[in-house]
A protein has these predicted regions:
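Small-residue-rich hydrophobic transmembrane alpha-helices
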Residues: 60-120, 157-176, 286, 299-363, ...
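Short alpha-helical transmembrane segments in multi-pass integral membrane proteins
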Residues: 1-34, 88-155, 186, 202-268, ...
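Residue-level hotspots within the lipid-embedded alpha helices of multi-pass solute transporters
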Residues: 38-39, 75, 115, 119, ...
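Transmembrane helical elements of multi-pass membrane transporters/channels
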Residues: 29-48, 149, 160, 227-231, ...
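N-terminal transmembrane alpha-helices
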Residues: 18-50, 54-55, 68-87, 112-119, ...
Length: 472
């Protein structure tokens, strides 16, 4: 007999002892679609990166220069909008559906205002950003254009992220997964026509003329922007048309409430600060890498893309951990919150250990997907093998942080990530890069991720993350 998250939440609210098989079933029901989504999304990103990579190392380096800045801006926004999903999970766990829909409505207002403001900010600084990051003058025009076009799509990217995370909080991991996969497929299709010029291709023995704009790096950015627009619109459409606890067609107020603002500050501000701390450290790391030459920049950027094959599975399980722990806390079941957190964390460590082995063995082949440059492949494979050793503990930190955030302990996650990233990774990278180049930077990364996993496991075991209690 299958059981849904909604049914399990009802059992928790009644104070019943939930069988372990039901717990495992719900964990798998939420985790598997998210993991498969992340795998498909990662595969599409591989294809996307390969399309740019085959233009040349300079094109890859242009995007790599601003990639950490896209992480910074989107990461801060994601930290804020994830606080709405955490509120929804806890309210649904407490069977406060009206409050959950109220949070959804307020998130729509937030996305419209903040998303447009962020887009304007990104476009405004795009002309100067590559220079601030120390990019070679030959890379700055493409890097600037990429960041400006990407920034313009932020309102849609926020919409897709917010509404998809809320659907997961309600126990539906399949729909947002399908939307995300479709978005990535569209990104690849758009890029196929926008990046490359009109050209002759042989398909099944037939010579065909394939139309293309030949916009290169700006074309890649536009493809991503258009795909985000479709994804955000679809996610909103699901919430408008589908019946269920989050159906916004049901009567309710659009008024901004004090409780929502308090929870946004309590949970969202530390999440945004955490993303800012991590991403700004990445910006500084990119600046360190920028001084190591075009080959190192390209190998670093493509290596990050290749590594995502490992850690994206962890982020899929993190989505499930956040929803499950959030609903358990809302139902006032600390015992179930602990059970969910350890089950999900163990799953994350196991899967990322396996993918880490695969990354170590097939590192050259992974790099070869993205570029034909032999020097970039050799250097990228070397640093990927260093990073593979840290994947299990990286998985522990990813999933444990999701569980803690579901309980409202975003401040604890922020502190651990801040200490780890700024105290360990940046310090080591600064010391090692002048002597060991990109290899030194990635050794610093691998060591830091291992220590971060240890810190999160210690906090998870101590249990103080549950003392934050349910939201207002």
């Amino acid at each position: 007999m299958s059981i849904s998250l909604e049914q399990l939440s009802a059992q928790m609210r009644r104070g019943e002892q939930v069988p372990l098989r039901h717990t495992l079933q719900v964990v798998l029901t939420l985790s598997i679609p998210s993991i498969l989504q992340q795998i498909v999304v990662t595969a599409m990103e591989y294809i996307d990166a390969a399309m740019v990579g085959h233009i040349g190392a300079s094109a890859t380096a242009s995007i790599g220069i601003v990639s950490s800045s896209t992480w910074l801006l989107h990461g801060m926004l994601a930290g804020l909008y994830m606080s709405f999903a955490i509120q929804v999970a806890q309210y649904l766990g407490a069977d406060r559906q009206d409050d959950a829909r109220g949070v959804l409505r307020q998130s729509m207002i937030f996305n419209l205002v903040v998303g447009c403001a962020a887009a304007a900010f990104g476009i405004g600084i795009s002309r100067f950003l590559p220079g601030w990051l120390g990019a070679d003058p030959s890379l700055q025009a493409d890097a600037s254009a990429y960041f400006a076009i990407w920034s313009a799509s932020l309102p849609f990217a926020m919409a897709m992220g917010t509404y998809s995370s809320m659907l997961r909080s309600a126990g539906d991991a399949l729909t947002p997964g399908l939307i995300s996969v479709l978005t990535c497929v569209l990104d690849v299709i758009f890029n196929f026509f926008l990046i490359n010029p009109t050209r002759e291709m042989t398909v099944f023995g037939q010579n065909l003329t394939v139309w293309g704009l030949g916009w290169g790096v700006p074309g890649a950015a536009l493809g991503t922007a258009l795909a985000n627009a479709v994804g955000g619109t679809l996610a909103l459409g699901v919430l408008l048309l589908r019946d269920g606890p989050l159906c916004i067609r049901k009567p309710g107020s659009w008024r901004i409430t004090k409780a929502c603002l308090q929870n946004l500050w309590k949970v969202g501000a530390p999440l945004a600060a955490e993303r800012a701390a991590l991403s700004s450290a990445q910006v500084l790391l990119i600046r360190i890498v920028s001084g190591l030459g075009t080959t190192a920049i390209a190998a670093n950027s493509l290596g990050v893309s290749a590594e995502s094959l490992c850690y994206m599975a962890g982020y899929g399980i993190q989505d499930a951990a956040l929803a499950l722990v959030g609903q358990a806390v809302g139902a006032n079941r600390r015992d179930m919150a602990k059970r969910f957190s350890w089950l999900c964390t163990g799953m994350g460590v196991g899967i990322m250990a396996l993918t880490g082995v695969g990354m170590y063995i097939f590192a050259p082949q992974l790099m070869g997907i993205f570029t034909a440059d032999a020097a970039v492949i050799a250097l990228g494979a070397q640093v990927l093998r260093i990073e593979a050793l840290a994947e299990p503990m990286f998985g522990a930190s990813i999933v444990a942080s999701g569980a803690m955030q579901g309980a409202g302990d975003s401040t604890g996650c922020f502190v651990l990530n801040l200490v780890s990233m700024w105290g360990i990774r940046l310090t080591l990278a600064t010391l090692l890069a002048p002597h060991f180049g990109l290899v030194g930077v990635w050794f610093a990364m691998s060591f830091e991720l291992t220590m971060r996993g240890v810190l999160f496991l210690v906090r998870l075991a101590r249990g103080k993350w549950l003392d934050k209690g349910a939201l207002a």
